Amino acid sequence: MNIVLLNPEIPYNTGNIGRTSVLTNTKLHLIKPLGFSLDEKQLKRAGLDYWHLVDLVVWESYEEFVEANKEARIFYATTKTKQRYSDIEFKENDFVMFGPESRGIPEEILNAHKENCITIPMIDMGRSLNLSNSAAIILYEALRQTDFNFKK
């Protein structure tokens, strides 16, 4: 599996997702611009002593990421769809993208990939769940569906 963070803003979330990625043998993709430095203390603190083990790919732009992954199945996590993440039949090499914490994936990207937009059901009381929690929820459903096959 692959987790993709488009323009992440909060180092603690990215560090926590990095730790989850290590313990599930999942590749983590970060798409610039980032809201922090990869050397930041908060990032490494959230990732504990796992950060140096993260299978990390850093992309200069969304366009570069898309060009390099043309054949990939990419799902876009958003609150702006009705299609539940649990209704998807995930495959081992799928990608799940999450947008910046403050605004989510841009509308133009979502509109271009409506059939691959997925959501986590929740009540209408708040905007969204925490990014690292959302990544873990969807990742573990994908891993459950693939029999927790932790290979790359």
Where are these regions (language model features)?
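Post-transcriptional modification and biogenesis factors for structured RNAs
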Residues: 1-152
